[in-house]
Regions:
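Fe-S-dependent hydro-lyases/dehydratases of central metabolism
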Residues: 1-653
Length: 653
């Protein structure tokens, strides 16, 4: 049998391990990316490691998420990150240049390369045939040292796309349909490889929408072939030399196949409070909408915004709706201005925001109390937009524009009728507006050596956990429901995002929106354990959702299941991720129960731990679904201690 594209790339970067699905492998990393909200921890870790310069082909620091300067904290972070990038040989994409994933695939993406990003939507780059994986910041710091990436060998799922989207539909419909079928945890351990006749007609930003939101299924990543569409895209970006054709073999072997006929899709909507709560838009209960946001890394390409503008043409935003738009990059913004689409948006009453992630991660445009917001972004968790009482619905840009006009859920066809066919005439440019003046290239080693890293008062130390002891006595400090997200653990918004380089401050708000007493309670307990339901830690890659509990004394998370990136972050920061052997034990445990474990280190190594509930007088078993390397990291007290040992051993060898 032939090979999938995924397997070809993994084989070309393979360092060691067992390429059987579910087994541990180590692969070479070519590129890394970080963004401003999470990157401070990454660069603090890299500083602590002690290397003078990154050892990747290309590392980029994007200042793109929080551009709202309400006090000193965020500008402190940006100045620190820019100075650290200069010191360590890293590119900087300055504020206003664009959202990390859009800029990276446009200006740095190379088919066949492996990229690690400190953001869960890093798989965006799979649109051009890269293997792009979202991880926590400590894993990015590790990759920047040149140490191979630790990965569980994925299953590869073939997604066969046939047919053609009807006018007024968007590739957003494809990924929403995938979420409807696969669910928010069904993609765990999988790479989704998109093939089929419909793929050949799909432009790169449309593919990126699908690859980007594969993260919502819990997937390791998603990938498309590097074909004629990729060749056209890279030529339009003025980088034709970056193109290499990369295709799966015709007889490629896959672990599973999913078939989707695009002709059968209609406009879809993801209802609160999970992105897999998907139904046809016309079947959704009509709600009066107060806010519409068109933007985010998922759906703010040239074609996305141009099509939304054409839906608005001749119409105006409903008087009861606040409609905003954030374009994905300066490059796309200038192109839209040149072609008249920005004027169409302004004429319709759309408010244009700064080029940034912004509202997607609750930095501005928080909905009203009990408000209904329709967005083209990727997540609709409770509180994701900054207000836990709001209800967030996810749709395509075409449907978002129609909804803004009507004031309730609507499609482009509802507004345009037969003229909706005009939308099919919109394509990505044959030549993009190239201006890299807001990308700062790495300094030479000689110049970098002269750079002093600038630390404002908001830049605090990176906490480093101690290795686990032989005995653990710890109460339960928090019992979580199913599908707790990293937003629940560490809130988004401009206020909270600006605290993320200051763990002593940020930790005070751990679980703040759902249990305001948690931080004080956990700190008073000294050491404690968190109990979780299914899919604990889904969503964003923010490692603060592991660091903050660790700083407050949390030693372990015991859950029914744990999301991939969050499990890795727990391991990296010395919190032991444990899974119930019998899910019924979850119901027997209560907050503040006192737990006891003997011979903890020995049991960790055996991957099976017996825990006694001293309060209720019973024992139960948990398992550790960790690789050999992850067990080593846990026993060492986290990745930073492990990496330092490894690099010191290399020096002595």
């Amino acid at each position: 049998m032939g090979k999938s594209l995924t397997r070809k790339i993994i084989e070309s970067h393979f360092v060691s391990g067992d390429m059987t699905p579910g087994k541990e492998i180590f692969i070479k990393v070519d590129q890394t990316l970080t963004h401003d909200i999470n990157a401070v921890m990454t660069y603090l870790a890299f500083e602590a490691i002690g290397l003078d310069r990154v050892r990747t082909e290309c590392s980029v620091s994007y200042l793109d998420h929080n551009l709202l300067y309400v006090d000193n904290k965020t500008p402190d972070d940006h100045i620190y990150l820019q100075s650290a990038a200069k010191k360590f040989g890293v590119y900087v994409s300055r504020p206003g240049n664009g959202i990390c994933h859009t800029v990276h695939v446009s200006r740095f993406g190379v088919p066949g390369k492996v990229s690690m990003g400190g953001d869960s939507h890093t798989p965006h780059g799979g649109a051009i045939g890269m293997l792009c994986i979202g991880v926590g910041g400590m894993d990015v710091a590790t990759a920047m040292t040149g140490v191979p990436m630790r990965l569980t060998m994925p299953r590869v799922v073939r997604v066969n796309l046939t047919g053609k989207l009807r006018p007024g539909c968007n590739s957003k419909e494809v990924i929403l349909e995938m979420l409807r079928r696969v669910t928010i945890k069904g993609g765990l351990g999988n790479v989704y490889e998109y093939v089929g006749p419909a793929v050949a007609e799909m432009e790169i930003p449309a593919r990126a929408t699908i690859a980007n939101m594969g993260a919502e299924m819990g997937a390791t990543t998603s990938i498309f072939p590097a074909d004629a569409q990729v060749k056209r895209f890279l030529a339009a970006q003025g980088r034709p030399e970056a193109y290499t054709e990369l295709l799966p073999d015709e007889d490629a072997e896959y672990d599973e196949t999913i078939d989707i006929n695009l002709s059968e899709l209609e406009p879809l909507i993801a209802c609160p409070h999970q992105p897999d709560n998907v139904m046809p838009l016309h079947q959704a209960e009509k709600k009066r909408v107060q806010q519409v946001f068109i933007g985010s890394c998922t759906n703010a390409s040239y074609a996305d915004i141009a099509k939304a503008a054409l839906v608005f043409k001749g119409h105006h935003v409903n008087e009861d709706v606040s409609c905003t738009c954030a374009v994905s990059s300066k490059q796309v913004y200038r192109q839209l201005m040149r072609d008249g689409y920005v004027e169409m948006l302004l004429d319709a009453g759309v408010r244009l925001l700064e080029i940034a992630c912004g509202p997607c991660c609750a930095i501005g445009q928080t909905p009203a109390t009990d408000g209904v917001a329709v967005r083209t972004s990727n997540r609709n968790f409770k509180g994701r937009a900054g207000n836990p009482t709001a209800k967030i619905y996810l749709v395509s840009p075409e449907s978002a524009a129609a909804t803004a006009i009507v004031g309730t859920f609507a499609t482009a066809e509802d507004i345009m009728g037969e003229n909706v066919k005009i939308l099919d005439s919109i394509h990505e440019p044959d030549q993009y507006d190239i201006d890299d003046s807001m990308i700062l290239p790495p300094l030479s080693p000689e110049e970098a050596a002269k750079v002093e890293i600038v630390r404002g008062p908001n830049i605090k130390f990176l906490p480093v956990p101690e290795p686990p002891q032989e005995t653990l006595d710890a109460p339960i400090s928090f019992k979580a429901r199913d599908n707790v997200s990293t937003d629940d653990i560490t809130p988004a918004s401009a206020e909270f995002s600006s605290m993320r380089s200051n763990i002593p401050l940020m930790s005070q708000y751990c679980y703040h929106r759902y249990d305001p007493e948690f931080a004080a309670r956990a700190k008073e307990m000294g050491q404690s354990v968190i109990i979780g339901g299914e899919n604990y830690g889904q969503g964003s890659s923010r490692e603060h959702a592991a660091i903050n509990p660790m700083y407050l004394g949390v030693k372990a998370v015991i859950a029914k299941s744990i999301a991939r990136i969050h499990k890795g972050n727990l391991v990296n920061h010395g919190v032991i991720p444990m899974l119930f052997e019998d899910g019924a034990d979850y119901d027997r445990l209560e907050q503040t129960d006192e737990l006891h474990i003997d011979n903890l280190r020995e049991q960790i190594a055996a991957r099976r731990v017996q825990i006694t509930d001293k309060t209720k007088g019973f024992s139960f078993w948990v398992k550790l679904e960790l690789t050999d390397k992850e067990i080593e990291v846990v026993l060492n007290g986290g990745q930073l201690r492990t990496l330092k040992k490894q690099l010191e051993a290399e020096k002595e060898a």
